[in-house]
């Protein structure tokens, strides 16, 4: 796809506001989250790649939410350990 238009993207999202939010989250994932693009990266910026993914119908809120789930250890796990108690 040579040029992405808003009309191409609006076929897959309900309105322009949702388009802005979805493309912003996806572009941030591509730029900083280490997520792999679903379309070929043709020397484009992350925002253009995100819009191309939306225009091709490959991106949705469900997909982004699924990728944002991170399984981490609890922040206070060290406090639960009895060996860390003050004497």
Curated annotation (Swiss-Prot):
Manganese recorded as keyword: no
GO terms for biological process, alphabetical: DNA-templated transcription
Keywords from the named record: DNA-directed RNA polymerase, Nucleotidyltransferase, Transcription, Transferase
Pfam families in UniProt: RNA_pol_Rpb6
Superkingdom as given in the UniProt entry: Bacteria
Keyword Nucleotidyltransferase among UniProt keywords: yes
Catalytic activity: RNA(n) + a ribonucleoside 5'-triphosphate = RNA(n+1) + diphosphate
GO molecular function, one term: DNA binding
Gene Ontology annotations for the cellular component aspect, listed alphabetically: DNA-directed RNA polymerase complex
InterPro entries membership: DNA-dir_RNA_pol_omega, Pol_omega/Rpo6/RPB6, RPB6/omega-like_sf
Enzyme category, top tier: transferase
EC number, as in UniProt: 2.7.7.6
Record's subunit section: The RNAP catalytic core consists of 2 alpha, 1 beta, 1 beta' and 1 omega subunit. When a sigma factor is associated with the core the holoenzyme is formed, which can initiate transcription.
Family from the record: Belongs to the RNA polymerase subunit omega family.
Role of this protein: Promotes RNA polymerase assembly. Latches the N- and C-terminal regions of the beta' subunit thereby facilitating its interaction with the beta and alpha subunits.
Record protein name field: DNA-directed RNA polymerase subunit omega
Source species of the chain: Pseudomonas fluorescens (strain Pf0-1)
Taxonomic lineage: Bacteria, Pseudomonadati, Pseudomonadota, Gammaproteobacteria, Pseudomonadales
